[in-house]
Amino acid sequence: MFALVDCNNFFVSCERVFRPDLEGKAVVVLSNNDGCVVSRSNESKAMGIKMGTPFFKVRHMVDEGRLTAFSSNYSLYGDLSGRVMSILADAVPHIEIYSIDEAFLHLDGIDPENVQEFCRSLVARVRQWVGIPVSIGVAPTKTLAKIASHFAKTHKGYRGVCMMDTDAKRLKALELTPIDDVWGVGRRLAPKMESWGVRSALDFVQRPKEWVQSRLGVNGLRTWEELCGIPCVEEENAERRKSICTSRSFADMIEDERELELRVSDFAAMCAKKLRDEGSAAYDVTVFMYTNRFREDLSQYFPSVTIRLPVAANSTQEIVGAALRALNTIYKEGYQYKKAGVTVSNIVPQDQLQGVLFGYDQTLRKKQDRLSELMDSVNADSGKAMLRLAAQREGHYADGIRCEHRSSLYTTSLDEIMKVH
């Protein structure tokens, strides 16, 4: 059996740990640059606020005192997430951390008759020790555990734990689950499935195996089998990703090409550092930019381009250089850009690089690699980006990011620790 532990409205819950006066009140947490809503309390959901709602559309609620908004405080969220995961890791032999607010627990070795009591004790322990409310779904597969955790979160009668331990419970849950809420289906594939008459998870599992495989391939069949109670989803390999992306919305729209070069250089440098951290290198560097889609009075432009490197790289110089070449090909004057980003993909292990025989300077590559290692070492010791390329901006990466509503760094900064009088 698997248990999916999901922190309820995680970012909002983190803020409430240090603001208990906000319990029962409408709260939202905003994305970078205070752009849009990325976490909502149940009260703000009841007010009709949707995920991704631009902040300017709900700012009047803040001004009227009906809503409290926080800028993202990732240092706080990351620290509290680590505390939650530490409690879970101490409770079971094996844990898979799926995201900042979710983890799968392997329940092997726990008496099936005691699983519900065990999970309820975990809910209480996390709440008491960290202050974060969690919901737990228990089922024979990870996909079913995801569904069970949703019921645990949305129905108070479960008291935080939903057990999907019989076939009758499984079929009832599938009947009540829309197909676009199934892990592995999502909103992109759901319309096509609905056109085939598959509107619920139960509709899906009632289709023959051959029908599923012919229309949805191996991945669709794996989801179908998971919903039938057959474990198919293997443990995620968190060590190496298919792509790495760094992007930000800008506090103020940018039109100047030089300023965009500085921002894109920062994003590319961060991607290169992430590649080195996980021992990987990438062949492809993609740059994309967006104008402000909410400004209908402005011209719109959403370009992107990918540069293929002759040899997979992870040095800051090579990744930044490719990103700037990409930017140069898509930049157009006369547009005001609200967001930009860099994605590195076609990722391979660093120790499995395939070089080219001609036309590539191996000596230069070694110099670039040594320089990147030196930058990483100095910056790690100093705790900030003391060494950077001339193409990058001066100062911290976060400089210029709007965060007018950020809470204190209660757990990670002695200067901002909560004071008791």
What is the predicted function of each stretch?
Residues 1-225, 233-235, 362-421:
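Gly/Gly-Pro- and Ser/Thr-rich, intrinsically disordered tail segments characteristic of DNA damage-repair
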Residues 10, 33-36, 292-295, 347-351:
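Short, charged/polar surface micro-motifs in flexible loops or helix N-caps
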Residues 23-25, 132, 281-283, 303-305, ...:
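A generic structural signal for short beta-strands and their flanking turns/coil linkers
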Residues 98-102, 139-142, 280-284, 335-339:
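Short Gly/Ser/Thr- and Asp/Glu-enriched loop/turn motifs at secondary-structure junctions
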Residues 104-109, 304-310, 354-359:
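Short, hydrophobic beta-strand segments
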Residues 146-148, 297-299, 353-355:
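Short, well-ordered secondary-structure micro-motifs
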Residues 181, 191-336:
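DNA-contacting surface of Y-family translesion DNA polymerases
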Residues 324-381:
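C-terminal hydrophobic structural anchor segments
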